[in-house]
Regions:
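Aromatic sugar-binding surface patches on proteins
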Residues: 110-123, 132, 249-259
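C-terminal motif of bacterial Sec signal peptides marking the signal peptidase cleavage site
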Residues: 15-18
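Short acidic/polar inter-strand loop motif in beta-rich domains
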Residues: 78, 129, 140-148, 267, ...
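Surface-exposed beta-loop interaction hotspot
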Residues: 127-194
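Beta-strand-rich structural segments
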Residues: 64-77, 189-212
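Acidic/polar, low-complexity intrinsically disordered N-terminal segments immediately downstream
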Residues: 20-100, 106
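Short, surface-exposed loop/turn segments at beta-strand-coil junctions that are enriched for proline
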Residues: 123-130, 261-267, 307
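Short amphipathic beta-strand segments in non-cytosolic proteins
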Residues: 89-104, 219-246
Length: 308
């Protein structure tokens, strides 16, 4: 019995030491401070037909994943802002074979009368590279005329893993996208988790004159539920989870809100099961709750990895 007790204690110490060493080495390897961005700065500006168009985003940068945007239009002859116009916004990715696709976005921008800008969002699905370029196609009405133009922009890689995204085909055959919006910098605590969920609208008519928005249409998924099961997948963590998590549901702004409880820093996997408005499973698998020390944790077929 005495030998057995010493044996158990030795095993516990070995697992604890291994966990601590792995975690320490892991943190030393990444050595990355996560920066939170709160200030909107200009990403790009350009002039067309006596108007100046300026587009702002957090940190003045477009990243792969979710980007909130603010657009202003100024008449360069009168120096007056163009207010409450109908402004459309369409991002298009062109590859080396001239194939063109888009990504989730708000096509009709919404005018903010208090701060006098047009608001929207874009979820870039890839970064700019020598083989692929992103262009923004924008139109608006000013001086009783419709003005249209395009602007080449650069999309950078998102180094903050707390803002990762994923795309997938659901069990219903539709193409979906989930993009994390917040928190940018989680704490060891219960954190409000915010995500956007979008679906590609398959065209029902032949393409018209390019860029035909009906061929590049996306919708905010409505009244779905994103079941949440966070785990620490590192082998030393033994499939560790946490209590008090809250599944994500849609709120008035169209985004999905829940709660994720991070009990320690490190590598986490947000395992999801997505249900439609009728409770039908669209994507995701249940993750076993077994304690598995020394084995990498299982993941849902629908998941996003984060790190803090």
């Amino acid at each position: 019995m005495k030998f057995f007790k010493h044996f158990v204690i030795a095993i516990v110490l070995a697992v604890t030491t291994s966990c601590t060493l792995d975690k320490t080495d892991f943190e030393a390897e990444i050595n990355r401070d996560v920066t939170e961005y709160f200030e909107f700065k200009e990403v790009t500006s350009f002039n067309s037909d006596n108007y100046k168009i300026s587009i702002e985003a957090l940190n003045g940068t477009f990243y792969k994943g979710y980007n909130e945007i603010r657009l202003t239009i100024t008449n360069t002859q009168t120096n007056e802002a163009l207010n409450n116009s109908e402004v459309t916004f369409l991002p298009i990715l062109t590859d080396s074979d001239n194939n063109k696709i888009s990504c989730p976005h708000r096509y009709h921008l919404v005018y903010n009368s208090e701060e006098q800008f047009y608001s929207g969002y874009v979820v870039f699905t890839s970064i700019s590279n020598p083989m692929e370029n992103w262009d923004l196609y924008i139109s608006f009405t000013g001086s009783n005329q419709t003005h249209t133009f395009s602007q080449l922009v650069t999309v950078q890689n998102q180094t903050n893993m707390n803002l990762n995204m994923t795309s997938f085909t659901g069990n219903d055959g539709e193409q979906y996208f989930i993009a994390l919006v917040a928190p940018q910098k989680p704490k060891v605590a219960e954190n409000e988790l915010v995500a956007g969920i979008y679906k590609y609208n398959q065209p029902t008519e032949p393409a018209g004159t390019f860029p035909d928005p009906s061929q590049f249409s996306y919708a905010e998924v409505e009244n779905y539920t994103l079941l949440l099961d966070p785990r620490m997948p590192e082998p030393s963590m033994g499939n560790h989870s946490s209590p008090n998590n809250v599944d994500l549901t849609q709120q008035a702004d169209g985004l999905y809100y829940g709660v994720v409880n991070y009990t320690m820093t490190g590598n986490w996997t947000l395992n999801f099961m997505m249900l439609n408005q009728n409770g039908v499973l669209i994507k995701g698998t249940e993750v076993p709750t077994d304690f598995t020390p020394g084995i990498e944790g299982a993941k849902s077929e629908l998941h996003i990895n984060i790190l803090f």
